[in-house]
C-alpha cells in the first residue's frame, strides 16, 4: 500500500456517482491507460499502456453520445473535456477504469488521476496529486494495480 496527499471532487466521495455531481466515486479500480504530454513530460517509467496527448484529443462527457466516457477526437459535436491544456494538470493522466465495461449512461465519466494545482484545488470528480508523486508511482504500477478510493 502506498499513500499520497491528494485532492478529490468538490462534492466529496460517493458510492452513487452521477454525471455532473462533482463527486469522486468510491471503490477499487484498475488503471486503464496513461495519457501524457510528450512535449512536457519526457522522463518516466511506466508498465501500463500509454498514449501521448495531442491537441485533437478529448474525453466525451455527454451521456447522450455513443462515445460517452470514451476518448474522442476533435472536431466532435457533443460535450467533451479537452485533454490538451495550457495549464499542466493534464500533462499526466491515469484513466481510472470507472464506468467503462459496461458504460452506464449518466453514471459519471472522465474519472482520472491527474496532476494537482499548486494549492490542491478540489476537482470535478477526479483525484489529483503532485507531479513528483505521479512520476514516482508510475514506476510502481502495472495493469494489475488498483487504486482504492474510500
Region roles according to the model:
Residues 1-124, 131-150:
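Cell wall/extracellular polymer interaction/catalysis modules
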Amino acid at each position: 500500500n502506498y499513500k499520497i496527499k491528494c485532492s478529490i471532487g468538490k462534492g466529496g466521495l460517493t458510492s452513487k456517482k452521477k454525471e455532473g455531481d462533482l463527486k469522486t466515486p468510491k471503490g477499487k479500480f484498475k488503471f486503464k491507460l496513461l495519457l501524457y504530454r510528450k512535449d512536457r513530460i519526457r522522463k518516466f517509467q511506466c508498465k501500463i499502456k500509454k498514449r501521448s496527448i495531442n491537441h485533437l484529443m478529448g474525453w466525451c462527457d455527454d451521456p447522450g453520445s455513443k462515445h460517452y466516457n470514451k476518448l474522442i477526437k476533435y472536431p466532435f459535436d457533443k460535450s467533451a473535456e479537452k485533454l490538451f491544456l495550457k495549464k499542466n494538470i493534464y500533462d499526466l493522466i491515469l484513466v481510472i477504469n470507472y464506468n467503462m465495461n459496461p458504460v452506464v449512461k449518466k453514471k459519471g465519466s472522465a474519472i482520472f488521476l491527474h496532476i494537482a494545482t499548486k494549492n490542491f484545488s478540489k476537482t470535478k470528480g477526479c483525484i489529483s496529486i503532485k507531479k513528483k508523486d505521479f512520476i514516482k508511482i508510475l514506476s510502481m504500477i502495472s495493469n494489475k494495480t488498483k487504486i482504492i478510493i474510500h
